[in-house]
Amino acid sequence: MSKDNLHRYLFENADVRGELVQLEQSYQEVLSAHNYPAPIQNLLGQLLAATSLLTATLKFNGDISVQLQGDGPVSLAVINGNNLQQLRGVARFKGELSSDGDLQQLFGKGHMVITLTPTEGERYQGVVALDKPTLAGCLEEYFAQSEQLPTSITLFANGKQAAGMLLQVLPTEGDHNAEFEHLEQLTATVKAEELFELEAEEVLHRLYHQEEVRLFEPVAVTFSCTCSRERSASAIRTVSREEIESILAEQGKIEMGCEYCNTNYSFDSIDVAAIFSNTQAPETKQ
């Protein structure tokens, strides 16, 4: 079965739309950079699926960041991406994590920040407290505050696969609560195994076989890291030459690693001289 796709669909006889995302390869690439424990693997999987759903829902051209921060064992979990469904993510934690801990146990007192940076127009940022036991619940609260449209979100992850569904009332006139609640009840019956193992068409048929559903062409979701040797060189340029020379004297080279993909960039004294003379550092060392 083809994985790593986002599927959009509409109900022909109700002013409600939906999305379904199934992830495997992109999820594994996010996890491969670090030896995450199971609770973090599941958290990042759900967050990856959620960011894909949000990217399609919020309809923008540019970059998106969904970041969870807290004072608990997990201090940070973030997925960054763009409207092309190119995503990357990382988490930071300390100590032992409870295998059955909910979102509040993982993050303690925390919040979620959703940032949209369009290629044109103003940057938008929304913040919601992590005061629900699940990520899906916090995202539903975000939509209640920002979009003010009834929205239902379902998220699953197991360390190998991640998946999610989003249901939302279309912004049209009239009261659509009854039809939304009916479809929400049907959607709530979906099982993780169905989303992990079945094609999207089969999942939708099982859930909504008495409804008329229009399914659009899938959009591929990929892992894509934006790190590069040039970006690392630019970061070095922001540090004082004196400090950089001090590190070189002590360590012989400057090592810079990407948290997202674990790629390491190495710069020696010749590279550093080129950086500070505003010429491109040689491409031979990485």
UniProtKB/Swiss-Prot annotation:
Molecular function terms, GO-annotated: protein folding chaperone; unfolded protein binding
Gene3D superfamilies in alphabetical order: helix hairpin bin (1.10.287.480), Hsp33 domain (3.55.30.10), HSP33 redox switch-like (3.90.1280.10)
Cystine pairs: C225-C227, C258-C261
Ranges that cross the membrane: none
InterPro entries: Heat_shock_Hsp33, Heat_shock_Hsp33_C, Heat_shock_Hsp33_N, Hsp33_helix_hairpin_bin_dom_sf
One of the record's GO cellular component terms: cytoplasm
Subcellular location: Cytoplasm
Signal sequence annotation: none
Major place of residence: cytoplasm
Post-translational events: Under oxidizing conditions two disulfide bonds are formed involving the reactive cysteines. Under reducing conditions zinc is bound to the reactive cysteines and the protein is inactive.
Keyword field: Chaperone, Cytoplasm, Disulfide bond, Redox-active center, Zinc
A Gene Ontology BP annotation from the UniProt entry: protein refolding
Protein task: Redox regulated molecular chaperone. Protects both thermally unfolding and oxidatively damaged proteins from irreversible aggregation. Plays an important role in the bacterial defense system toward oxidative stress.
Family: Belongs to the HSP33 family.
Name of the molecule in the record: 33 kDa chaperonin
Organism for this UniProt entry: Shewanella woodyi (strain ATCC 51908 / MS32)
